[in-house]
Amino acid sequence: EIQPIAAPILDDSHKLTPKSSIEFRRVGVPQAMYYRDLFAHRLGTTSASEHFVLLLDGRVAGVVGFGSAFSRTFQQRQDGRAYMTEMYGFTAPSERYPRLNRLLMMLICSQQMHALWRPRETPVQRYAGISTTCLCQHPELKINRGILKLVSRERQKNALWKLSYTAEWRKETFAEALQRWLKTHGSEKQSRLK
């Protein structure tokens, strides 16, 4: 049975600042699916086996899932390097911060996120960064520009595009990623609140 964790959801009354706390909390499938269903409206099952909620100032701002078995997530891409595979990532709906998903992507591409995976690495098996695959109606996802690199694009029979992206670990902490995001997406000008 799906269920929430003991934390409120980030809403438009809360303002993020450069001093806002950032935490990725590992959760079980019931908690992850609660937020995934809430934020993305029942997408069905997922093959992710590592699930995290993103907490900003103690409020649930997003949920993200990764493959966990090293053999499954250690995927060789066109450049011959291995990347941790993001299976899904969704954020709470926000009028104040319509680009909240960009923050989630920036955070999971940071070296601080890499630290969560480093204990699984070996001298011959190291993650170069994050990879993900998206299905969409357009040949590129604007939300990923400047964060992820488009490495392949394939038109599907159903007219959707299958897009594969990678990103190397960015040399920044969660706090530095938040500050960078706030400069471009955290201002009142970006807000849809009037």
Per-region residue spans from a language model:
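Acyl-donor binding region in acyl/amide transferases
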Residues: 26, 48, 56, 67-180
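Short amphipathic alpha-helix that is part of the acyltransferase structural core
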Residues: 2-46
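Contiguous surface segments at macromolecular interaction interfaces
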Residues: 1, 32-33, 163, 170-194
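Short glycine-/small-residue motifs
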Residues: 62-63
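Charged, low-complexity intrinsically disordered segments and flexible loops
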Residues: 1-15, 78-81, 121, 185-193
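Residues that form generic nucleotide/phosphate-binding pockets
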Residues: 35-39, 107, 181
